Regions:
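Residues at the starts of beta-strands that form the adenosine-phosphate
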Residues: 1-2
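The conserved SAM/SAH-binding core of class I Rossmann-like methyltransferase domains
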Residues: 6
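Rossmann-like adenosine-cofactor binding region
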Residues: 9-105
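Rossmann-like dinucleotide-binding domain for NAD(H)/NADP(H)
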Residues: 61, 67-156
């Protein structure tokens, strides 16, 4: 397994990244990704960075994670891709819009895990341990087709 990083200045190395490329290479590397971990700011150049056209380039077993800003992903394109089996799943800590409307199909999409915008936050050590324990427990439950802890029933 190798890790490909994408950044504005690809000459700057980052720990854990095997191969760094610039944003101009994004379309070329998407087809190789097993996991897309998006941690980008909200700027005009990152708005809907992952859109329907780019989602179509992903492997059908790819997983999309967004822990940056919600508008980096075209929400409707992602919902359509999940519903149509174009990708394996998604983990969203941020959405567009935020909060995600109750009527959004992502809430009932079994291949989508949504967390309440807690990635990257500064917490007490005890709180961080609890967040990690809940998240890991829910990932295990999700992977085994079991009910998730702390799931909120939605009425629309």
């Amino acid at each position: 397994m190798s890790t490909i990083g994408i950044r504005r200045n690809p000459t700057v190395e980052a720990p854990g990244i095997d191969h760094m490329v610039g944003f101009e290479s994004l379309d070329d590397v998407l087809q190789y990704a097993d996991v897309i971990a998006m941690c980008v700011p909200s700027t005009p150049s990152t708005h809907h960075l992952l859109n329907a056209e780019r989602i179509a380039k992903l492997k059908t077993d790819a997983i999309v994670i967004n822990a940056g800003r919600g508008d980096a992903i075209d929400t409707q394109a992602l919902a359509d891709a999940l519903a149509n089996g174009m990708i394996r799943g998604a983990g969203l800590d941020v959405t567009e819009p935020e909060p995600l409307p109750v009527a959004s199909p992502l809430w009932s999409e079994p291949k989508c895990l949504i967390t309440p915008h807690v990635a990257g936050g500064n917490h007490l050590e005890s709180t961080e341990r609890r967040i990690i324990a809940i998240a890991l427990g829910n990932v295990r439950c999700y992977a085994n087709g079991q009910s998730l802890d702390n799931r909120m029933p939605l009425k629309g």
